[in-house]
């Protein structure tokens, strides 16, 4: 409420106090960290906004440099919108664990279209605050409803849930997806209330100087669009340095990348996306920095 009343600093102070008073901060630091091994694959897609380009081909390469699909350039801050974990004007790198998840972020619901895609691989292990949280306890009830579906034999670990109740509240708050009614299809949403708490969380992580690279969380769109896939994880990595132009050297030093592929088939199936993912994984990779 402080945030909506125009007091973002008060909102952060209250958020920080709640994490401390309810011992959620300790849960985040001790239970909610995950290591991703080096040479893991991450994907980032971007809608193709160039009309009538290479219609006679299904795909091409070299239309873009890999950095074109990295975080927004510092000199383009004015174009950076508010995202789930990052405030307007603050560049962050958003990547996905598989191509289907990344594609669904560019084309939510039943949308589809031509796009550019790149695969990044991390040069060293990466460390994240894990908001997907299969680790806290094994039941998947958090994203499937509290009661097990009919026919399931899995039991509900009430004790495990209560032990980490504060952490689960934070996880739920970070995954809310609200439906907004647009007066016009061309209307652009510049503010989403469900982003307030995730953005406060990222601010808190930066303020604590935790030895993590970012946050891992479930993709709300991929879970709906491709229910058959398992690991629909997204990752956000905030920039470590704020420069006048270019890209964050610290983030660039973490990754190698393949060349950018551009696809013009507007109706790709999940299996076709999986095939593209394998092709990207087997491509040649070069260091970003």
Task: List PLM regions with ranges.
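Glycine-rich, histidine-containing beta strand-loop boundary motifs that form or position
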Residues: 96-97, 117
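Short glycine-enriched loop/turn motifs at secondary-structure junctions
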Residues: 84-90
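Active-site and NAD+-binding cores of ADP-ribose-processing enzymes
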Residues: 1-78, 109-110, 115-289
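Short active-site loop/helix that positions an aromatic residue
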Residues: 99-111
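Short, well-ordered beta-strand elements within core beta-sheets of diverse protein domains
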Residues: 90-96
């Amino acid at each position: 409420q402080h945030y909506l009343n125009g007091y973002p600093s008060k909102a952060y102070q209250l958020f920080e106090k709640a994490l401390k008073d309810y011992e959620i901060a300790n849960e985040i630091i001790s239970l909610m960290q995950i290591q991703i091994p080096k040479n893991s694959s991450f994907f980032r897609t971007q809608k193709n906004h160039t009309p009538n380009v290479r219609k006679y081909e299904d795909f091409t390469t070299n239309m873009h440099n890999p950095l074109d699909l990295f975080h927004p350039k510092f000199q383009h801050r004015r174009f950076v919108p508010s995202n789930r974990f990052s405030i307007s004007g603050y560049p962050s790198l958003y990547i996905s664990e598989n191509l289907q998840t990344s594609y669904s972020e560019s084309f939510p619901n039943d949308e589809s279209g031509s796009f550019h895609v790149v695969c990044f691989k991390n040069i060293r292990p990466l460390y994240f605050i894990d908001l997907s949280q299969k680790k806290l306890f094994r039941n998947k009830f958090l994203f499937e409803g509290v009661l097990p579906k009919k026919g399931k034999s899995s039991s509900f670990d009430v004790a495990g849930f209560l032990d980490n109740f504060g952490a689960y509240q934070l996880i739920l708050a970070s995954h809310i997806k609200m439906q907004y009614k647009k007066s016009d299809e061309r209307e652009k949403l510049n503010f989403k209330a469900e982003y307030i708490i995730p953005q406060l969380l990222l601010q808190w992580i930066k303020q604590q100087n935790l030895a993590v690279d970012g946050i891992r969380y479930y993709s709300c769109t991929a879970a709906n669009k491709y229910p058959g896939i398992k690991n629909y994880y997204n990752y956000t990595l905030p920039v470590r340095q704020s420069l006048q132009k270019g890209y964050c050297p610290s983030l660039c030093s973490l990754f190698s990348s393949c060349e950018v592929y551009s696809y013009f088939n507007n109706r790709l199936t999940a299996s076709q996306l999986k095939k593209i993912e394998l092709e990207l994984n087997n491509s040649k990779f070069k260091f970003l920095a």
